[in-house]
């Protein structure tokens, strides 16, 4: 399944056009490499998706759903150091 469709179908991002824009902006990575919207997502892939203030690290499951491995919010690091 294409990356943009995967993000939309699993409601990680609400609209496919927004998912395409996020990918084109370099905000979706696998193993530190930026992915294109046309990347074919496979079970076992670990993706890092940055959207808004949120960054998700997700594992793609066998049924093409996902499991959240880590969730961070931009700005949280600043508050913790105070």
Residue locations for each model-derived region?
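Strongly charged
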Residues: 2-5, 17-82
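Loop/turn elements at beta-strand to alpha-helix junctions within RNA-recognition modules
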Residues: 12-13
